[in-house]
Amino acid sequence: MSLIKNKNCFIPKKIFSEKDDFIFIPCDGVIQEKFEKIALSFESPKLNEINFHKKVKIIYFLDDYQHEIKKEMLPSSIISIIFYNIKNILSSDSIPDTVKFLGFNGYKHQITNEIVKGSVTSLGVGGDMGYPLDKHLLNGSSIKTLCFDGNYSHQITNDSIIDHLDYLCLMKTKFPLNEKSLKNPLNIYPPTIPKNISFYETYKFPIPGTIFPKIESTIITFNINITDIRQPITSKLFQDLPINYNVYIGWGYRHKLDECTIDSKIRFLGIGDVVHPVPETFLGIRVKFYSGYSHQIKPFPNNASLRELALGNVKYPITKDTIPSPWGVGELSIDKGYDFKLTPDLFENVRALKLIDIKSTVFTKHSLPKSNCVLAKVSLISLQIPFDLSFFPTDIINTMLIHNVSQVIGTNQLPKSLTSLSLIKVKLDPKLTIPKSVSHLKIEEIDRPLTKESIPNNLEVFELLNYKFPISKELFPDTVHYIVIGETINPFTIEMIPTSLKHLVSAHDYKFLPFDKPLLKYYYQ
């Protein structure tokens, strides 16, 4: 198992080489306060003889540590414990409830939910384990991150991969993933596959697309993260990869990508910190350059169907020539880290724009063209800069999403041409009047109640989610025919129904189910 290194350490030379950089407790059991990570071996004293300070967060039990391990002997500050080739049999009395990460390398006994308690959210296994990891012995656990490392000695099977993980990390293993490792044998829905599957630099096997199971739903997606792995990826990954998987390549990936091609399927490809530039033939139809891409982004071929282009922390700006002609790009996303000024010529063929946590020097009132463009949709996410109508072409934008911005949203922030508006986690001007043209309105976690005057008279679809104020009939004009109701402080009743209502849908957090009987004829599950 890969162990954490630290510059501030002192080394037991009989056990470790100088490069190991472990923090080791000597026989006197004294820990200087600057150390948060400590290591215990057969030379170390018993736990109850060590004077732990409150800054100790990580403990390594190393190489034949023989003393008793009891949770009451450990400080309450501990959040991570790694067991490295210990012979002790651990029990429910061994692990404190404060521990979030447990690592086992060369552990010869079964790992069960008796040891891995509910507080543990991350688990690492590696080395010559006595038994393969068995998820059935971990029922009821809260594991969201699982790592295989340290030349893990068993085949990684479906029984080894805990269901519904957020992250599966594959490092140094004795055997590769195969077509049965991730496959859900019972076809359970939603699928039990990890949301993120990461292959790290010590992973030494090819990564074919066939090891990733096909999912019938096209709504659910998963991420494959590829770092500087030993073997280059090939076209075999993409040719056989189901469309549900997004692929991110970066983190120092050193192999050339020339021989790899993306097929025409609807696939998202992320390109980050790679050693070699990406050729045009490698790019798909949904591409993101992120996390230190240090090469010039080459122009996409003309007539290319580019549905989405996202830019993050890249070294060079895009230009007008980057975007293919004549079809342009479906959505251009400018993410946090992009540090170049946006100019109107970039947006001549951009149909949707998403801005995420960018600087005021990047996006100004002069960035977007005010006419002669096709920009119909704008999403503003986590912006900490002021904006108003002068920033946008006000006669063509029909869809706008505003999420978690610092700007107070009033009438002067909303184009009159809008037909669809989403306001999520925003502050509203008390005098806000939503444009009359809006027919689809989504509201979630706003800071003040809506009024009858603020709601457009032609509203047809109304999503009212996580609304912290009383709801009443005046919120639902008689033009509304579709309502989605989420968390509210009082129930939606028959008195609130607009005369035009056809469908009533409850979000997952609506707590006043079942609806009253008169409402059931509208209820759509």
Swiss-Prot record:
FNIP repeats lie at residues 65-107. It comes from Dictyostelium discoideum (Social amoeba). The keyword Repeat applies. The keyword Manganese does not apply. This is FNIP repeat-containing protein DDB_G0274617. Keywords: Repeat. InterPro entries: FNIP, FNIP_repeat.
